[in-house]
């Protein structure tokens, strides 16, 4: 669902290097901040659209480019690109994005929300574990193993997960075990929703052929309501 909002490509510091991202602003120019974390395909039009849709809901949304401009629509190539991204480098880029947003005059919140899909779902949880009090809401959509921390004790954010019962990349049993691990190790508010769909059911570009409009609409509304409640 394409939404037009004020947006721009931005550059920010990350561990002494230049990083890039896509920034979408609400019409007012100000709002609570949200980090949007890409899938293994790269910083695609779909991820930009997610940022635009969040901006239309009143958020300042930044989607960092974890691949340095590379994009693919081929599953095998995407898997290679994901495996070639060191988790430490991904974490550094996201840490720089957090600092950039929190320092922005456009951001009205003192903490940030974060939402991510596929690979980005794993990095959402890593970001919450590493950044502690800076992240107030973490929303992973069908996160895979990439980027997921071993220890969730640093999580201070409320967590809302969206996972598929028929996910061939991340079994639902693993998601349920992860949900319980986060709850036990962090003491945070954790709620995972499980949908009768497949991996990437929310991606309306449909590169995997698994898009489900009804499930996507339900999950998106839950996520937006949660971010509005926890990240404002």
Where are each of the predicted segments found?
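Serine-hydrolase catalytic machinery in alpha/beta-hydrolase-like enzymes
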Residues: 1, 7-107, 202-205
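Alpha/beta-hydrolase fold nucleophile elbow
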Residues: 106-117
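Gly/Ala-rich beta-loop-alpha elbow adjacent to hydrolase catalytic centers
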Residues: 116-120, 124
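Conserved hydrolase catalytic core segment
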Residues: 126-136
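A conserved short beta-strand
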Residues: 134-144
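Short beta-strand/loop motif that positions the catalytic acidic residue
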Residues: 155, 161-163
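Conserved alpha/beta-hydrolase "acid-adjacent" motif
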Residues: 169-174
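C-terminal catalytic histidine-bearing segment of alpha/beta-hydrolase fold enzymes
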Residues: 185-232
């Amino acid at each position: 669902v394409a939404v037009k909002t004020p947006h721009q490509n931005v550059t920010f510091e990350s561990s002494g290097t230049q990083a890039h991202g896509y920034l979408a602003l609400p019409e007012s120019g100000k709002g609570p901040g949200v980090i949007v974390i890409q899938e293994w395909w790269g910083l695609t039009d779909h991820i930009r659209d997610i940022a635009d849709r969040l901006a239309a809901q009143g958020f300042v949304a930044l989607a960092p480019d974890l691949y340095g401009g590379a994009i693919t629509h081929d599953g095998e190539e995407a898997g290679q690109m994901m495996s070639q991204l060191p988790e430490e480098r991904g974490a550094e880029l996201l840490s720089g994005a957090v600092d950039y947003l929190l320092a922005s005059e456009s951001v009205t919140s003192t903490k940030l929300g974060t939402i991510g899909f596929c690979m980005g779902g794993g990095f959402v949880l890593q970001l919450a574990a590493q950044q502690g009090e800076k992240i107030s809401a973490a929303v992973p959509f069908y996160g895979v193993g990439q980027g997921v921390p071993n220890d969730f004790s640093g999580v201070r954010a409320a967590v809302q997960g969206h996972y598929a019962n028929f996910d061939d990349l991340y079994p639902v049993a693993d998601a349920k075990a992860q949900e319980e691990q986060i709850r036990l190790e962090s003491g945070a508010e954790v709620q995972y929703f499980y949908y009768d769909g497949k991996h990437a059911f929310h991606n309306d570009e449909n590169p995997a052929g698994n898009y489900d409009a009804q499930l996507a609409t339900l999950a998106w509304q839950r996520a937006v309501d949660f971010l509005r409640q926890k990240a404002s």
